[in-house]
Amino acid sequence: MLKQVEIFTDGSCLGNPGPGGYGAILRYRGREKTFSAGYTRTTNNRMELMAAIVALEALKEHCEVILSTDSQYVRQGITQWIHSWKKRGWKTADKKPVKNVDLWQRLDAALGQHQIKWEWVKGHAGHPENERCDELARAAAMNPTLEDTGYQVEV
């Protein structure tokens, strides 16, 4: 039987682009582990993706995961858009490169070994774990120490 794990995520950006951070909580059998990091220049969508990626990559074996995010971008990307992007060689319907492709590919790889149920929660609406992730993400964004090497300035 697969271990049942809950993951809660959030990303934050002070300016978009600007300094950003992510926060994630991984819960298994009542125990929690938190993750957060801040980047000097990034976007909110990249930080939303990073939160999910880092938490999933921390899992050491196949798990049944309920992943809660307040990001429609992440939820729709993974449940609706990614299959078409992959078929088209990571291009959008209008044949443009998928934005944040480095992180989408990393998330896709992290998902491969787990059974995932995606849940959307309304941000800033009092959901306790989402609020905690938001606090982690904002604190990391206010004290960025990393460079987001995959971030590309849009022309």
Curated annotation (Swiss-Prot):
Domain of life: Bacteria
Residues annotated as binding Mg(2+) 1: 10, 48, 70
Chief localization: cytoplasm
InterPro entries with a match to the protein in the record: RNase_H, RNaseH-like_sf, RNaseH_domain, RNaseH_sf, RNaseHI
Binding site for Mg(2+) 2: 10, 134
This enzyme's EC code(s): 3.1.26.4
Family the UniProt entry places it in: Belongs to the RNase H family.
Protein name: Ribonuclease H
Organism, as annotated: Escherichia coli (strain 55989 / EAEC)
Gene: rnhA
